[in-house]
């Protein structure tokens, strides 16, 4: 049985960690390095940093904080936001990131997934998918979601895009379920299961965790990792207690 991963997500904007609800109304959560160090010391398996404004503003991620994070933690971390080329990815990996994640740039240029996988190996290439469920239950991929003014439907359906990114060479998918983001009432299990059924690569659930049982429900579907932000930033769930709880439920967890 593969070890399940508990991942903390740190949304970065203007050099600070922020958190919104359903990708809106972002509030300051603290210093990037301090939070990274806190999570590294308190049992999180992996960190994901999303520069949520980089793609929307057509900016580059600051290499300075990426390098500082690498110096201050001893767990794997992934960086996302505005990565449009092999050169962008190479710089971030050279500054200490273990993986890079692409979202809107992959929708604009799907071949970027293949090029990154060939240059750095599939294990380094994560594709983030911002999935919105409309009033009819249709799953739609959105892009430029870091800013309410730029967020829009990409024209692709979630399930179609999940299949496509796998064929293009993605090594992992993070499914960001937009409707559930920050509301703490559980992952969208119906959506998660639909994606998991067609996913042949590691799948990470994101959006909706509010209590320990929510992580268990998601892991029972077979997914590889569960990502959360609000419950960890606000210390509503203790990471070490969560891991013990999941291990006691029979899951393979790194304590």
UniProtKB/Swiss-Prot annotation:
It comes from the Bacteria. Keywords: Amino-acid biosynthesis, Cytoplasm, Histidine biosynthesis, Lyase. It comes from Campylobacter jejuni subsp. doylei (strain ATCC BAA-1458 / RM4099 / 269.97). One of its GO terms (molecular function) is lyase activity. Gene3D superfamilies: Aldolase class I. CDD domains: HisF (cd04731). Heterodimer of HisH and HisF. Pfam families: His_biosynth. Pathway: Amino-acid biosynthesis; L-histidine biosynthesis; L-histidine from 5-phospho-alpha-D-ribose 1-diphosphate: step 5/9. One of its GO terms (biological process) is L-histidine biosynthetic process. It is found in: Cytoplasm. InterPro entries: Aldolase_TIM, His_biosynth, HisF, IGPS_HisA/HisF, RibuloseP-bd_barrel. Its main location: cytoplasm. Belongs to the HisA/HisF family. IGPS catalyzes the conversion of PRFAR and glutamine to IGP, AICAR and glutamate. The HisF subunit catalyzes the cyclization activity that produces IGP and AICAR from PRFAR using the ammonia provided by the HisH subunit. The active site is at 11, 130. This is Imidazole glycerol phosphate synthase subunit HisF. The keyword 4Fe-4S does not apply. It catalyses: 5-[(5-phospho-1-deoxy-D-ribulos-1-ylimino)methylamino]-1-(5-phospho-beta-D-ribosyl)imidazole-4-carboxamide + L-glutamine = D-erythro-1-(imidazol-4-yl)glycerol 3-phosphate + 5-amino-1-(5-phospho-beta-D-ribosyl)imidazole-4-carboxamide + L-glutamate + H(+). One of its GO terms (cellular component) is cytoplasm.
